[in-house]
């Protein structure tokens, strides 16, 4: 439901000025913001003034088909878009990477060679993969807080919120087949929204380019511009004969969407209007200076160092074996992605002086808040952050070290399943684990990262178990020799013979003991304290958020991203990352050929692409480059405010047609989860014409093109 921005909940609390209610006269930056689609009518005037030709109802409607009905949450952390009347779905290569890997083997290396289903029968099912369409979203604050009064405690408030949320979810999911719902807190609990989804779980792999296209540039180019990565994969949604969600079955038929995106062949020019429609994961736009300082000065540097150790170990062994490269390709990409992002985030925060800027803002807020209920918020937050820091540090080290030891995590999970009599579940875990496990990588990472834990984490946070093991073996290296040498979980055949009756032996195994002892330490010595302090901080942020809205009543506050559907709009724009340097907003095939190097894995393109380039056989996908010669567009950048989760999001032009799919941000702008800078923040998108060129000229899969609708 749409509201006008001023609400009073039933408790008679202070009036809260909500983000969408007042068009900003003091909005921080023109293209900053991740806006709720159901309230987009509050922004549509600004969007139209910048060139958008459609209405708010075209973007989001519950009464008629709208663009929202062509956008999906892909899996649990990406976005995808429907591009045909037969359920064809486009997302990023890195979003579908796990599925491509699962179908790959040395004999059928779809990661290396790509995969294209030339018929419906060849499309590959993906157990566990689902896509979710948003049916509707609405403000349910009054429903969720019904029964709460100011004299109740926070624990009682939590109970009321939980009970009311569960009841509401139960009611709305009974409305039809395949429905699931969530109730999400916005503005730190000042507002609650219901999100109702229809989830389809028969999603089949249709096509993916080879990694030399879909992952071109690898980790070297990740987060960077200019970019030349063909980061896309294609799936198809299937439904039962009535178009309802259904488990995989050969009897299922392609899903018929309410709406799908038409594809623009008109290309992009500097200044063109763009908007990204997707599911951004997490932002922290409103945290105070002390929270930012911890991120940039302590957390990011520590995590970068720990992941460097793991990446170096993986790289060493992956370069020596094709089998190991396949096994660890997805894991390596996962570790490297955040590793590089944190580096850019840290640099951006420091370059912008975000900590100092927030401190100055806090001084002005404190002066305004004198004599009000908000006067003590900032000192209390500052004190809580100081108390929280060592626990957060210990938790982050645990996550990046002990919790990342593959063998121990696996052993602990299998032992738990077997002890509970779940032999089938244990067998499934084992099959997936051993397929993609290489002991030397795991052991090498253990030695490096656990050594860092012992050195960097204050001794008061060292588990007693760890102290005993180091005293016993004398060094982390010797400890690793014993653990990996003695654990039966390094042997798949031995694990396959385990039964529930072997519980004592399993729990005495060094790998299981490692996992369990660290979990117990974290559960008793870290988590309870961190949870309590974070809870106190969140409660204060609820008041601080409300105070900021009263302090700046003309500013448009958008809710932090939380993996719910958002609209971010901006324009095609280059940028200057350094003095004397300007990056144009479009990259082309010429850049791919400049980077092409058969001696470097990440830059070794398919021979077929070299042949097409030599013959200039570009077909209808050709454009005239800056040098006046024919080329093919590859990627572009724009000023849309995006985050993790926006991977695979449709990038849409002024007429609502698809011009690309979002897949990254520029490295200099990765601090946009905390502070958006219009000079540096750019989202990187794959030009839809390069997708079509790849399907047509490299894959020769023109049957897919025939499903699509093109506009100029």
What are these regions (language model features)?
Residues 12-22:
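Bacterial N-terminal signal peptides
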Residues 2, 6, 21-712:
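Terminal presequence/propeptide segments associated with secretion/organelle targeting
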């Amino acid at each position: 439901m749409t509201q006008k921005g001023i609400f009073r909940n039933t408790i008679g609390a202070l009036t809260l000025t909500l983000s969408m209610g007042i068009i900003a006269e003091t909005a921080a930056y023109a293209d900053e913001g991740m806006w709720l689609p159901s309230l987009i009518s509050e922004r549509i005037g600004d969007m139209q003034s910048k060139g958008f030709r459609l209405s708010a109802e075209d973007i989001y409607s519950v009464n008629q088909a709208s663009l929202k009905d062509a956008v999906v949450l892909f899996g649990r952390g990406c976005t995808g878009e429907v591009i045909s009347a037969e359920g064809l779905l486009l997302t990023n290569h890195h979003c579908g990477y796990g599925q491509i890997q699962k179908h790959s083997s040395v004999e059928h290396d779809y990661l290396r060679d790509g995969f294209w289903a030339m018929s419906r029968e060849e499309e590959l099912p993906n157990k566990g993969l689902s896509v979710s369409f948003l049916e509707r979203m609405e403000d349910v604050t009054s429903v969720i807080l019904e029964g709460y009064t100011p004299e109740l405690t926070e624990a009682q408030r939590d109970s009321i919120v939980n009970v009311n949320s569960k009841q509401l979810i139960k009611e709305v999911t009974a409305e039809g087949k395949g429905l699931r719902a969530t109730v999400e807190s916005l503005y730190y609990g000042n507002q609650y929204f219901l999100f109702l989804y229809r989830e389809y779980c028969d999603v089949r792999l249709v096509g993916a380019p080879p990694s030399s296209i879909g992952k071109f540039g690898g980790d070297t180019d990740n987060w960077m511009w200019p970019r030349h990565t063909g980061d896309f994969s294609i799936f198809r949604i299937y439904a039962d004969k009535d178009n309802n969600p259904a488990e995989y079955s050969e009897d299922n038929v392609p899903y018929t969407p309410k709406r799908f995106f038409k594809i623009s062949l008109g290309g992009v020019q500097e200044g063109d209007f763009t908007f990204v429609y997707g599911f951004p994961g997490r932002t922290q736009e409103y945290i105070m200076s002390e929270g930012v300082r911890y991120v940039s000065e302590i957390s990011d540097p520590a995590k970068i160092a720990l992941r460097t150790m793991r990446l170096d170990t993986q790289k060493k062994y992956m370069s020596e074996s094709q089998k190991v490269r396949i096994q660890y390709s997805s894991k390596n990409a996962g570790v490297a992605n955040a590793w590089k992002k944190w580096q850019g985030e840290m640099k951006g925060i420091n370059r912008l002086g975000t900590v100092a800027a927030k401190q100055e803002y806090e001084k002005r807020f404190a002066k305004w808040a004198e004599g009000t209920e908000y006067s003590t918020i900032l000192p209390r937050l500052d004190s809580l952050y100081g108390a929280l820091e060592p626990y957060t540090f210990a938790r982050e080290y645990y996550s990046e070290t002990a919790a990342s030891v593959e063998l121990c995590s696996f052993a602990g999970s299998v032992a738990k399943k077997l002890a509970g009599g779940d032999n089938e579940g244990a067998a499934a875990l084992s099959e997936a684990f051993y397929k993609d496990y290489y002991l030397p990588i795991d052991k090498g990472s253990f030695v490096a990262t656990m050594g860092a834990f012992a050195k960097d984490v204050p001794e008061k946070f060292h588990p007693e178990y760890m102290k005993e093991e180091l005293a016993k073996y004398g060094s982390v290296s010797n400890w690793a020799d014993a653990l990996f040498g003695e654990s039966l979980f390094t042997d798949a055949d031995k694990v396959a013979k385990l039964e529930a009756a072997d519980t004592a032996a399993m729990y005495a195994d060094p790998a299981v003991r490692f996992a369990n002892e660290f979990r117990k330490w974290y559960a008793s010595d870290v988590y309870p304290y961190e949870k309590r302090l974070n809870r106190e901080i969140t409660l204060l942020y609820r008041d601080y958020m409300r105070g900021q809205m009263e302090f700046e009543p003309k500013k448009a506050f958008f809710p932090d991203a939380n993996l719910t559907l958002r609209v971010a709009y901006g324009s095609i724009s280059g940028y200057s990352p350094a003095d004397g340097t300007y990056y144009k907003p479009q990259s082309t095939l010429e850049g791919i050929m400049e980077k092409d190097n058969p001696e470097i894995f990440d830059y070794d393109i398919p021979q077929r692409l070299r042949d097409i380039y030599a013959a200039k056989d570009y077909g209808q996908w050709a454009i005239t480059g800056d040098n006046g010669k024919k080329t093919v567009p590859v990627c572009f950048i724009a000023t849309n405010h995006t985050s993790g989760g926006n991977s695979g999001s449709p990038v849409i032009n002024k007429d609502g047609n698809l011009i690309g799919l979002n897949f990254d941000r520029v490295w200099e702008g990765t601090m946009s989860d905390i502070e958006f800078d219009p000079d540096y923040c750019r989202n990187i998108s794959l030009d839809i014409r390069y997708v079509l060129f790849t399907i047509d000229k490299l894959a020769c899969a023109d049957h897919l093109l025939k499903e699509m609708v093109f506009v100029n």
